[in-house]
């Protein structure tokens, strides 16, 4: 399971060091794709397969389903870590997530999210949910 929040930097070649705690669970190959909320999602191959199977079952006749599948798959790329535990993030994905130099890498149970430091701060400021509101929403979801 991926948990935690880490501050990292992207170098001039678009490479990001993956937190060492995440590397073993990611495996040799993994998927990097556009995420929601202006971030990137990183999935192990096993988790990607689970998501892929669910997305393949969405009805082709549903416009929203088609749009979501296009969004997710068009941005996806298979990645490997280099010898120093880094991934190269393609330009189109860096643009999608507004990634420049300072980034936040977070573990979100089954995936990793990569955020621009500014976007992560803005997301947290915009949320402005109290712990009570979050607890109420979790209760509505059965958690």
Curated annotation (Swiss-Prot):
Locations listed in the record: Cytoplasm, Nucleoid
Mind telling me which GO cellular component terms the entry cites?
cytoplasm; nucleoid
Q: What is this protein called?
A: Transcriptional regulator MraZ
**Xref: InterPro entries:** MraZ, MraZ_C, MraZ_dom, MraZ_N, MraZ_sf, SpoVT-AbrB_dom, SpoVT-AbrB_sf
In terms of HAMAP family, this protein maps to:
MraZ
What Gene3D superfamilies does the record tag this protein with?
Answer: Transcriptional regulator MraZ domain
GO BP term (any one): negative regulation of DNA-templated transcription initiation
One GO MF annotation is:
DNA-binding transcription factor activity
Task: Keyword check for DNA-binding, yes or no.
Answer: yes
Q: Which domain of life is it from?
A: Bacteria
Classification lineage: Bacteria, Bacillati, Bacillota, Clostridia, Peptostreptococcales
Oligomer and partners: Forms oligomers.
Q: Which family does it belong to?
A: Belongs to the MraZ family.
Q: Where is the SpoVT-AbrB domain?
A: 5-47, 76-119
| Species of the source | Alkaliphilus metalliredigens (strain QYMF)
UniProt lists the gene as mraZ
Keyword terms: Cytoplasm, DNA-binding, Repeat, Transcription, Transcription regulation
One Pfam family, short name: MraZ
């Amino acid at each position: 399971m991926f948990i935690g929040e880490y501050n990292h930097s992207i170098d001039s070649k678009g490479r990001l060091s993956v937190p060492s705690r995440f590397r073993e669970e990611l495996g040799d190959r993994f998927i990097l794709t556009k995420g929601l909320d202006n971030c990137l999602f990183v999935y192990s191959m096993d988790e990607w397969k689970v998501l892929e199977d669910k997305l393949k079952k969405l009805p082709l006749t549903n416009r929203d389903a088609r749009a979501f599948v296009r969004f997710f798959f068009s941005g996806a790329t298979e990645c490997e870590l280099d010898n120093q535990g880094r991934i190269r993030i393609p330009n189109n994905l860096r643009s999608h997530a507004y990634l420049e130099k300072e980034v936040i890498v977070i573990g979100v149970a089954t995936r990793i999210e990569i955020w621009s430091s500014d976007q992560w701060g803005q997301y947290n400021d915009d949320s402005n949910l109290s712990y009570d509101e979050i607890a109420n929403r979790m209760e509505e979801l059965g958690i």
